[in-house]
Structure formats: structure tokens, C-alpha cells
Amino acid sequence: TSQPQSKSIYEVGFTFNDVDKIKKSLSTQKIFMSSPIEITDNSIGKYCPYFTDIQNPIDHCATTAITDIHRNPLGNINMGGTTDGPIMALAIIDSSPSLDSKQDVVNHVFQTMIKILVCDCWEDRQPGGFESVSAWLDVAAEKSAESTQNTLTSKINGLENMNLILKITSTNEKYLWTLIILK
């Protein structure tokens, strides 16, 4: 009998090519993505941060800028891993001047990333008891507004064997929404 081959983390889940699917989907919502820029030098940590709970190194990163229809910057979508494939994806959106001033953009970008990179299964699974991605974001925004902490973090673990981390950071009237998807 032969043993089943275990697949490496790079062979399961999303790939760097999924950026094209995200770009196409976001364009239907009038959100536009630049072509990815490959980063392999020592500035990689700025775009694809290292996480202590990731065993695998990140030595390859692709970053894209996202803008509205008028080319106003909204944020970035980045993927990191090795040349074999990504192990993390990250979206960061600046919603300044207020926490909810770009709520539609945050919803569209984060829902699109989860649907394409994780699964189109949120409504069926309702992870964390949230019936939708936007319900998760709404509760996080409420908790962030009530909090005295600069950063609120909410995690959903194990959706299609991936971990989702939502961070809302507020400093000096600047609000950053970050979604991290880890394989």
C-alpha cells in the first residue's frame, strides 16, 4: 500500500494567479487594482509582514495598489510566500477620515478576497456566528469604536483550513482596516 502524499502549503489553496480574479471582480465594483509588483529585497517585510505563527518563510511578495474610479488611493492587496506560492494574503484599506467613511470599499474588497482565496461558503458556514462577512466587519467596527485600544483584532480560524485576521487600527484620525488570510 502506498502512503498518501501530503501536499505542501504552497500546493493547496490560493495562488499568486488569483490576483487576476480579484482584480476582475473588484473592477465590477468600480475598484481598480494595479498590476502586481514583485518584491524580493530587504523591504519585503514592509509589504508582506512576518508572522510568528507561520513556520514557513516569506521571501517573495507581490503588492498591488487599489484605487477608486478617480484614481484616488484606497489601499493595497499583497500576497507573500516563496516562488512556489503564497502562504498569506493581505488587504489594507485606509478609511480616513472616519472609521466608516469607506465601508462599502472595505466590504467589497474583504468579501472578494475571502470568496476567491478561501471559499464562497461564508453564508453556509457562518464562522464565528456571523451570517456574512459584512456582519463580521460591522461588529468589529462597533467594538473598535467603543475600545480605548489603538488596534482591534478579530480572528476566525479554520475556515477551509485557513485563518482570517481582521485588524482595525486607529491613530490620529487615521483608520486602517487590514484583512490577513493565512494558509
Task: Spell out what each predicted region is.
Residues V19-D104:
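Extracytoplasmic beta-rich ectodomain segments of secreted or membrane-anchored proteins
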Residues T28-P49, C119-I156:
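Short glycine-rich, low-complexity/disordered patches
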Residues I58-N72, V139-E160:
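Short, solvent-exposed secondary-structure boundary motifs
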Residues S154-K174, L179-I181:
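Short, exposed beta-strand-loop hairpins at the edges of beta-sheets
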